[in-house]
Amino acid sequence: RAVYSLEEAKELVRELGYPVMIRAAYTLGGKGGGVAHNEYELDEIVIKGIANSLTNQVLIEEYLGDWKQIEYEIMRDSDGNCVTVCNMENVLGMKVHTGDNIVVAPSQTITNREYHKLREIAIKAATACDIIGECNVQFSLDPNSEDYNVIEINARLSRSSALASKATGYPLAYLAAKVVLGKTLPELFNQVTGVTTACFEPSLDYI
């Protein structure tokens, strides 16, 4: 939840309990954020976060450091055709920011059931947001159950998009530009493979 002062932060943490994740609103790369395990750390991070935020706002939530971090790259066109281009796993999980994490494709520690469950949710999320082009959907996943959270949806090309393109041979930037201009996935060919359309989901037999 969003708070604008240290007093509001302390009141919220009394409800949530420690540890908590604190993020400064409208910053990049985790600037001004951190994990608070006690009131001293809470004071320090909240004051710093509010100072770094363009809106003098910090977001506080339950810390999920032991949870897995899973990503899906999704491509969707104006006709509603939607494919999963790549599935990735942040090896160090939620405790390390995705920009500093080690990422592997495809995911190595989730079950087939978990893979398909999160894939379906990623496609539903892209559809609900009416994404036209490419997007990245990130999840936290409890390693001891199938509980999950949607962390964020990036409706743009990102660091993950570059990795996904390299790992799969699916030219995300080129095809996303074509889709945004009105082309549909079935009528676009993957110029890297030369034989598949953009509707073809890459399948990796390597890491």
Task: Label each region the model flagged.
Residues 1-33:
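A conserved helix-loop-beta module that forms one wall/lid of the active-site cleft
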Residues 19, 29-31, 36-207:
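ATP-dependent carboxylate activation and anion-phosphoryl transfer catalytic cores
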